[in-house]
């Protein structure tokens, strides 16, 4: 890490990591996930570089930003293999995978009252195995690894009112927007392009309101997730619940 000037710093890092398969990946669940006791640990060499900083122009304004890029060379990448017709899956190893990507984030704060934030991520994860074990060319070479979002972002906005109804109280209003680009459920090399299973693009908006008093000892929160009731899916194209409401009360005891 090196500080170039006060609002601008640079950070470069390298790491070698090993990820062992978890129990579900090795043994399955007995119904929808098949066991694969031959699953190998995942090894990766990771290179990261980022620019970041905080700027205080005055009058209670604060800006924070970070831009980063990364490259990961992964051996025995663990991923899910989906059997669409059977509705089952199994964790398998992809012998060689390269992950290239970039991320950006910006945050703004005004006197602890107004907070704005946005971020976007791009992750290009591709199969790098040119030939199969029998020497034949691999059809999935340079394909994106399926069932994995590769472009997504979010926007957040919060505003806090102080001393509403009670002294030493705070009322915070918040709204968030999340976006995910569509991606393939299975390898893009298999089947006709127009008929491939895809997880469609998703646009989800959430809203919440939190009221706290007695210096945060008592907290009451109300939240509405997906308040526009848009269709949403998880990584396996299983539909998530639509609009939902939640209420929560917290009491801190010293």
Describe every region a protein language model picked out.
Residues 64-73, 92-186:
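Gram-negative outer-membrane beta-barrel transporters
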Residues 9-13, 41-100:
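Membrane-embedded beta-barrel scaffold of Gram-negative outer-membrane proteins
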Residues 31-39, 87-93, 101-103, 134-145, ...:
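Extracellular loop and loop/strand-boundary signature of outer-membrane beta-barrel proteins
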Residues 1-6, 20, 117, 132:
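Signature of Gram-negative outer-membrane beta-barrel scaffolds
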Residues 20-29, 41, 76, 80, ...:
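Generic structural "secondary-structure junction" signal
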Residues 1, 8, 12-13, 40-48, ...:
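Conserved C-terminal beta-signal and adjacent last beta-strands/turns
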Residues 23-30, 77-85, 123, 127-137, ...:
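Outer-membrane beta-barrel translocator domains and adjoining extracellular loop/strand segments
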């Amino acid at each position: 890490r090196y500080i170039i000037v006060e609002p601008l710093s640079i950070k470069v890092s390298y790491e070698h990591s090993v990820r062992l398969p978890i129990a579900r990946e090795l043994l399955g669940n007995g119904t929808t996930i098949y066991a694969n006791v031959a699953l190998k640990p995942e090894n990766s060499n990771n290179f990261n570089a980022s620019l970041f900083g905080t700027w205080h122009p005055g009058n209670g304004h604060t800006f924070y930003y970070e831009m980063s890029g990364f490259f990961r060379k992964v051996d025995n990448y663990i991923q899910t293999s989906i059997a669409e017709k059977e509705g089952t899956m199994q964790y398998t190893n992809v012998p060689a995978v390269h992950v290239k990507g970039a991320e950006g984030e910006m945050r703004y704060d005004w006197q602890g009252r107004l907070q704005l934030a946005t971020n976007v991520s791009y992750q290009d994860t591709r199969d790098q195995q040119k030939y199969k074990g029998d020497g034949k060319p691999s059809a999935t070479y340079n394909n994106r690894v399926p069932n994995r979002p590769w472009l997504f972002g979010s926007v957040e906005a919060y505003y806090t009112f102080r001393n509403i109804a009670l002294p030493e109280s705070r009322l915070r209003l918040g709204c968030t927007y999340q976006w995910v680009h569509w991606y393939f459920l299975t390898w893009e090399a298999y089947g006709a392009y127009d008929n491939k299973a895809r997880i469609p693009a998703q646009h989800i908006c959430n809203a919440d309101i939190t009221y706290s008093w007695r210096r945060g000892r008592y907290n009451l929160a109300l939240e509405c997730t997906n308040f526009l009731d848009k269709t949403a899916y998880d990584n396996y194209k299983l539909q998530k619940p639509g609009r939902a409401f939640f209420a929560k009360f917290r009491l801190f005891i010293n």
